[in-house]
């Protein structure tokens, strides 16, 4: 039978046609996929971003700070904008970014500033920090040298303060500002020095010295700069400002680099790099021990091009000389062409120096970045970023010397240059001394507001930091704050609302469609050269539509789409660099900011909530075990005298009324704590005294009870004292057989009666 059934099954299977799945249709995208495009300074256009790795890995080098002074708002714009770009590329597009940034701690500006600071400090010390006549004479000499060097004055040199003031009052200052951006800085320096010279006797010496510093240090450096030989002088200044820069970046929530490189730690590699360029035929040494890059030979090479970022600036001597540094010798330097730039500088007296094949010297500015970037990232790098003011000659020289070193055609694939920052229309610069430091800005604006301001303008465009921009930023910030608080409140309400309908009405469907459209717009914005202004505008519009839905839907609103929208907005803001709350329903509150979020509410109320929660737990435990009323009262005393007092809250009990609540200063709290401690100490002392008295009573009672054990008829049975007794045990004769006197008998009788009474008190009457 089993054989028959198996055969039948086999026949059925063989005779049944083979079952196949229906054909699956490949989905056809409704639109072409949007790809990430970046504005590349090497093409001056937006081009598709294609990492050389062919996968998710991206190599990125960014020019870091030259650390000789406080970082200003121009630096903030650059580093925050680059940080935003980096975050979007790695956190939105999902690339694995290896981000390298340098610290320039060997540079003409650093050498000069360190040297001048040292010399000026010594100048002050040598004069016992007194702004005396000797100081005034020196400052006057320095002042007139400064005036005649930095101002173009027709006729003879300025020799008196009156002559300068007369010239300045008649000068066309507006034209002079246009001709020389440093004109206002020089005027301020001179006027400060004149104030100290003329009013120094009535000024604080420290203030007077500080006002003459700018005009005095050039003369001191000219006279004594060459005598500086201690290398520690050139290390202390950059080390100090490097730490300050890092502190500023932390305040602005800028991500730290994957790798940080310092020039001072790369001198051997720089020497090797320069030698390789010489070996490849694109550099030459001069008689003084310097090495220059041969721009003409490089540019004539069929495989190379010079000045790829800004070819129109090729030959601009003012830019070239500025890039060479203020300590460079522009006359008779042995260069083949004025366009050539230093790879290695022969050190002069008063400058730091390192041994090299060409003599004692130090690295040129441009070579530093090439060496450090290549050491970590190799001969071909995906992205290089920095401020637009570095494009020529710095970045163009970087490209040239790196491509000369590796003898390749393209060292960098994408060059991203952030735009200038202007304050109310004026460019900021350390060299112009018209800058607002980051720390000064943070006293007026929160880190969030600064980041919003930078994100509100396309990263490669000029940004004018003015009142109208701040107004827009604060408006956006308030709108987001209100939206986040509303969604969190609605979420809390929904949690206690019980069973509600989940079905989407046309209102929810419309909101969902707006949400999907916004996601698409944000994606397109990020693909379009990381356009944060468009992305932020899209988020703002989505908030407006969500608020409209909340108003229209009323009590029938569905919380799910609102939470999804709020979480999405939070995610995008987090990607741009705004920290978010743990619940992802809004950005995190900022300590010390006045942003409408009232700081961290959780941090503020948590100690009080914990106090209340602990009190509740204790009351509940006592109630469960049916404790005595006094135990509950002890709890109320504890929360009043300890828990709330530790939180600077005092409760004053009042007859027939609720307790009076008082908030205490620390001093007031300490005073109450002191009084409570004294009260507690007094109570302990009383308790101790009571215990001691009780102990004494118990001791006396024990002694009395011990004494009571003796029967009255036995109390005088001491044969050393007495020899005869009556029937009650009272002595009748003393030890010598003499009769007891009447007075003694009376006394003994009294003692006997007392003992009888004591004995009967404890043991009853003897039967």
Swiss-Prot record:
According to the record, cofactor stoichiometry and binding are noted as: Binds 1 zinc ion per subunit.
Q: Where is this region: Disordered?
A: 683-712
The UniProt entry annotates the motif 'HIGH' region at 65-75
Record-listed ATP binding positions: 430
What Gene3D superfamilies does the record point to?
Answer: Cysteine-tRNA ligase, C-terminal anti-codon recognition domain (1.20.120.1910), HUPs (3.40.50.620)
Keyword rRNA processing annotated = no
EC number(s): the record gives 6.1.1.16
Tell me more from the record. Answer: Present with 23000 molecules/cell in log phase SD medium.
The protein, known as: Cysteine--tRNA ligase
Organism of origin is: Saccharomyces cerevisiae (strain ATCC 204508 / S288c) (Baker's yeast)
